[in-house]
Amino acid sequence: YHAISVTVWGRLYRRALFEKELRHYPLRLGEDSLLNIQIGCQQPRVRFIDYVGYGYVQRGGSANRSPLDIGYCVKFSEAVRAELVRHRDILGDRLEFYLLLNKMRWYLVYLRKSHNPWAGGTEFARGINAEAGRYRAELGGFFSRCDRLLLRMDRRRWMRPGVLAVSTLMRWGKSLKRRLAH
């Protein structure tokens, strides 16, 4: 069982939210994030369920096992941008910050995959690093120091092995903490 609080199945929704103007994007990963962004922009209060246990079954050909390429990160970012711009009146001057949070989250997932090639030189990655500099203090509340270190290291191709080493150590540390907690 896994504890999931940020995904669609970790919340209770009013049916009326689904009868409003929800858009459905043809994306193979992250559809739940887009749904939550749309609902979050419509609903002033959201209540989280502290723990959600579910039997996780993964089937062959599952999107979770699909390779995540940099093009997908860009495509997903564009879909999120479309939703946040659509609700600009609610977000105000926080729009760019929320876009950066989304881009960083997906790019960090991409970075941690050892089979993914270096993408630190792409316009997408360079843009994230440039924007992160403007919000350095605020990002500390959302991303660990190690996450931010991965982004800084990824600016240089020759540091790709270091990025993978740090991300592996982070994964092992997280796994060890989880095992010791039980």
Regions found by a protein language model. Name each.
Residues 113-182:
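Membrane-interface aromatic/basic loop that binds lipid-linked glycans or pyrophosphate carriers
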Residues 52-59, 65-91, 106-135:
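Catalytic core of nucleotide-sugar-dependent glycosyltransferases
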Residues 8, 100-102, 153, 157:
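Short alpha-helical segments used as structural interaction elements across diverse proteins
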Residues 1-69:
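Conserved nucleotide-sugar donor-binding catalytic segment
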